[in-house]
Amino acid sequence: MTSTEAAGTGKAPAIRANPALQTYYESQESYLVYEVVLRGSHHFGFYEKDTYWPFPVGRSLERMEAKLLSALALPSGSQILDAGCGFGPVAISMAKKGMRVTAIDIIDHHVTKARRNVEKAGLPKGQVTVEKMDYQHLESIASESHDDAKAAATGFFRILKPGGRIAFFEAQRSRTSGDYDEGDELAGHLKLVNEYTAMPTNELSREDYFKDLLEDAGFVDVEFTLPPGTREPREHWSYSALKA
């Protein structure tokens, strides 16, 4: 069985149709933001307290990647799944720290560019593998090998070995569009952001949303902390949890 075949079927892994997400990440706007401004990354930067000038952006992105790896608390040589890898900078960063990484994405040009970037990085063969795969359909990844959020959390739990850890940084909203009066201008803007940038959890991620999501999937010791350098104290949180 190859890594691009669903377990036991010989078929390519299932990709859930998501026109909004695919359209956004294939747009010129997406290219300008992620390729030009964020050097291929698809995540927030980490800024020290009282930082008001965000440039150069690359350093803040590297700091956030280091924070993520620290939250995983894994020894060198561990197997990591980078779900939604974009152009591969996080996978490459972790591989340079000695990790073995399976990087997945559903956008064709992301997969192509990530493979190219891995090759350019000069990493040992097989240390990073890049596949087109949907993190809501992880059937092709064997159990204990490492924008239906519930399905994704359940899938992550299944493939982790006992004692394995999940870690991510996510936005936890103090208010969503549903908290505003009908017709409110800000509510309308929030809905547009959610719809056209494929960010449906913006409508769901109230207090304890991600904690409950992880616990319902079976994770234990769920921790959530505000990174000390974050400038929006009610928005961005670090989450980590264990598979018992």
Swiss-Prot record:
Pfam families: Methyltransf_25 (PF13649). Coiled coil: none annotated. Pathway: Mycotoxin biosynthesis. InterPro entries: Erg6_SMT_methyltransf, Methyltransf_25, SAM-dependent_MTases_sf. Keywords: Transferase. It catalyses: 3-[(2E,4E,8S,10E,12Z)-4,8-dimethyltetradeca-2,4,10,12-tetraenoyl]-4-hydroxy-5-(4-hydroxyphenyl)-1,2-dihydropyridin-2-one = ilicicolin H. Its EC number is 2.1.-.-. It comes from the Eukaryota. S-adenosyl-l-methionine-dependent Diels-Alderase; part of the gene cluster that mediates the biosynthesis of ilicicolin H, a 4-hydroxy-2-pyridonealkaloid that has potent and broad antifungal activities by inhibiting the mitochondrial respiration chain. IliD catalyzes the Diels-Alder reaction that converts the acyclic 2-pyridone intermediate to 8-epi-ilicicolin H. The biosynthesis of ilicicolin H starts with formation of the tetramic acid by the hybrid PKS-NRPS synthetase iliA with the partnering trans-enoyl reductase iliB since iliA lacks a designated enoylreductase (ER) domain. Belongs to the class I-like SAM-binding methyltransferase superfamily. Erg6/SMT family. This is S-adenosyl-L-methionine-dependent Diels-Alderase iliD. It comes from Neonectria sp. (strain DH2). The gene is iliD.
